[in-house]
Amino acid sequence: MTVTNDPVVLMKQEVGKAAAQRVHSDTIIGLGTGSTTAYAIQYIGERIQTGELKNVVGVPTSFGAEVLARKYGVPLTTLDVIDKMDLAIDGADEVDPQKNLIKGGGAAHTREKIVDSLADVFIVVVDSGKLVDKLGSTFLLPVEVIPMAVTPVIKALEKLGGKTDLRMGVKKAGPVVTDQGNLVIDVKFDNIEDPANLEKTINNIPGVLENGLFVGVADLILVGEIIDGKPRVREIS
């Protein structure tokens, strides 16, 4: 692990390590996307390189996760070869008391949902700032859309009461493009009272590939906290 005194970084490292410790030999694991999950991938790789873990292969949820896995020596496979995973580790942008999630800050939520839903156990790694009473409180809901359907999808989302914004790139001109070659519309809903119903309703809009609501998928939440200046990990099951 990188040596640092930053308490937030230390917290992310501790949560990533706690998740990585739940990986056992002879397993297939889903490798999520995000800054906290990156530490889990790093630590899994270190355990593989030291021989502590054997016969472990990962399924990446994004090109970024694939790059990290290769960097740290985690062997990879694809869904063309396997049909389920023993464990998936991924982050989230919001978590409600029912363990429902909003994901997609990294525009990888479509592949994340596919991989996470195929795991026997799905572990979510977050910091305490991601815990909310209701989804949509602090984070916009990402919706992946095929390019030709952006305008009609925006109109449909606004009819549902959402305020929409086409996600633009940072350090690049133009909109964000997903690994699937699609665009992302970020939507603000004042209240998401029924996440399961909204997830289905949005996905039924023609042109929508997937949205960032993950309902009834997470099994365990590992929450990083700073207590008395030191990182701690709390479990929500």
Swiss-Prot record:
Catalytic activity field: aldehydo-D-ribose 5-phosphate = D-ribulose 5-phosphate
Keywords from the named record: Isomerase
Enzyme Commission number: 5.3.1.6
Signal is among the record's keywords: no
GO molecular function, one term: ribose-5-phosphate isomerase activity
Pathway: Carbohydrate degradation; pentose phosphate pathway; D-ribose 5-phosphate from D-ribulose 5-phosphate (non-oxidative stage): step 1/1
BP GO terms, sorted: D-ribose metabolic process; pentose-phosphate shunt, non-oxidative branch
Active-site feature positions: E112 (proton acceptor)
Binding site for substrate: T33, G34, S35, T36, D90, G91, A92, D93, K103, G104, G105, G106, K130
Domain of life: Bacteria
Entry-linked SUPFAM superfamilies: D-ribose-5-phosphate isomerase (RpiA), lid domain, NagB/RpiA/CoA transferase-like
Gene3D superfamilies xref list: 3.30.70.260, 3.40.50.1360
A single GO cellular-component term on record: cytosol
Keyword match Isomerase: yes
Subunit structure: Homodimer.
Family from the record: Belongs to the ribose 5-phosphate isomerase family.
Record's function text: Catalyzes the reversible conversion of ribose-5-phosphate to ribulose 5-phosphate.
Protein name stated in the entry: Ribose-5-phosphate isomerase A
